[in-house]
Structure formats: C-alpha cells, structure tokens
Amino acid sequence: MTEAQNIQPVTIHGLTLANFRNAESAQYTFGTGLIFITGNNGAGKTTILEAIGLTSFLRSFRFALDREMIRFGSSFYRIETGFSVGTAKHRLSIAFGRNPEDPKAALVKKYMFDGRANTRAAEIIGRIPTVVLSPDDLRIIAGDHAERRRFLDLLLSMLYPAYFAALQQYQRALKMRSQALKSRPDEGMLAAIDRELASAGVQILEKRRQFIP
C-alpha cells in the first residue's frame, strides 16, 4: 500500500451552504490565522463546523445520515468550500438529494472539484484535512469496537488514498456477496467474490496493524 499522501498547509477561505440543516442559503468568508465562531444557541455554529467536516470526511462527524442534513421541506443540500493548498486555490462541492422536478427519483450524492463534475469520492476525501474534537468523541473510547473502527477508517482514508480504495472495494464485495447469497449463485461466482473480499481485507488489516502496532 502506498505511503501517506503529503499533507500541505490548507487554508479555508469561504463556505457556501444551500438547504443544509437550518440554512436555506448562507455564505461565509474566513480570514487567515486563528478563527473563532461565536453566536447564540441555534445560530448555526455547529452547522458551519459540520459542513467543513463533511468536505473533509465526506460524512458527518455528528453521526447523521445525509438525508437528515437536508433542510426540512427541501429535496437536496449543497455545500461549497473555497480553500488553498500552499499557493494553489481550489473549490470543492458536495451535493446530496434528488431532482426537485422528480420527487420519485433516487437520492444521489455528487462531488465536484475545481469545476469537474462526477469527481470520485476517493479524489475528494482528505483534500481538506481536519481534526474534530467534540463530546461525541467519547464514543471512540467508551463506545463499542464499531465506533473505534469507524474513526480509524476515517483517519487512514485521509492519510492513505489506497486504504480508502481498498475499503470501498471491501464494502462493495461484501454487498455483492450478501445479494448473491439471496439468489443462490453458483460456487464460481461466490469464489470470485470471496477472493476480492480477501484481497481488500488483507490490505485493510495490514495498514491498521502498521498504524497501531
């Protein structure tokens, strides 16, 4: 598995929200240096942090599902972040929901990086490296093993793109195996899926052992 990607200093310059949590439309501009976000209860401080975390982890650090983050009465949410890595400026956006003109359409999550549509998740995760500390993080220590594995997967996915790819491969193969067992497949198909599971599983286990001796 490849070495950790080189993480350069990242500066977030702006954040735009549409139908995210309680924000129908909001735009924020950030300066450089240490930034404090203040406001009354319910003003949206945590929403800002959650949106930034979402562009980093591709999921909520508050353990919320994507559909739970869509503003009530809306069919989608959209987050756009402007940031720089060194002297290079970038824009990253995440959109989740369905076509408002087709209420029966499936919920879809899409990523865009520097104006390029249909960007893969593997190309996005870790672009904006963040560390989140909140009361919910006690779950990592006091919670069950699943919480610790989830945290470890997020951290390793940001550091090692190949780990994230192996994790996606494993989850995809696991889903295929579950579906195949329901339809009574032939042994050859199951054997092929099991080989894919084993290959991805070895890569995941190897990197976890390296990270936590």
What residue spans do the PLM features occupy?
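Phosphate-binding site recognition
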Residues: 53, 67-70, 188, 195
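Regular, well-ordered alpha-helical segments
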Residues: 54-57, 179
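Short, glycine- and charge-enriched coil/turn segments that flank and shape catalytic ligand pockets
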Residues: 4, 86-88, 184-188
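Pre-Walker A-like glycine/lysine-rich segment at the N-terminus of P-loop NTPase domains
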Residues: 1-54
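An accessory alpha-helical subdomain
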Residues: 139-213
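ABC transporter nucleotide-binding domains
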Residues: 33, 51, 75, 127-129, ...
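Nucleotide-state sensing region of NTPase/ATPase domains
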Residues: 57-147, 156-159, 163
